[in-house]
Amino acid sequence: MRFYYTLLATAAALLVHSDALSAAAETSLNQLTAVDGTTTTSQRFLRRHTDSETTDNEERLNSGPIVLDTAKKIDDLFEVEKLDKILDPKMADKFLDGKTFFGWLDKSALDEALNGNIAQKTKVFEHWREKRLRPKALTKVLTTDPAVRKKYKFVYEMYDSYIKYVARKKLSGLKRNRGD
């Protein structure tokens, strides 16, 4: 019961010291503005109004087209021109000119494996297998330079697949012979 008396006394004290009664008397519902009308205010706006915003438009777009130059910025970010220069196949040819690997593997054999038909590729891969060239060793040699890696990636992946194919074929032949 004391709580209610305390609450009533607090509310009465607040009403006495506030101007709630005078504020209620000043407001009037008779003063209505038009729907399209605007009222002036002396408060500052955070948004700056310009002549282009005279319509009731929520969008703040410029009237002209927006030109984005993101493709150029992305090219600059990744330095695409520099990468193209590094990965140029001509750079791979310059790197491999006059070099032999393992004492017998040269650029002409790599080019034949890259550009030849299936029979030529099989012949080259058989020759490499007879020389006991391991796919990991070939991959290690051909991935030393980025341009060589890009140009001859097909060769070392195909040679690895060829070696696995020959091993599977040999294993299946052994299984057939054992079953007879």
Swiss-Prot record:
It comes from the Eukaryota. Pfam families: RXLR. A motif (RxLR-dEER) lies at residues 44-60. The keyword Endoplasmic reticulum does not apply. The keyword Signal applies. Its main location: secreted. Induction: Expression is induced in presence of citrus root extracts or during the interaction with the susceptible host. It is found in: Secreted; Host cell. Residues 1-24 form the signal peptide. Keywords: Secreted, Signal, Virulence. GO terms for cellular component: extracellular region; host cell. The RxLR-dEER motif acts to carry the protein into the host cell cytoplasm through binding to cell surface phosphatidylinositol-3-phosphate. Secreted effector that partially suppresses elicitor-induced cell death in host and enhances virulence of P.parasitica. Belongs to the RxLR effector family. This is Secreted RxLR effector protein 5. It comes from Phytophthora nicotianae (Potato buckeye rot agent).
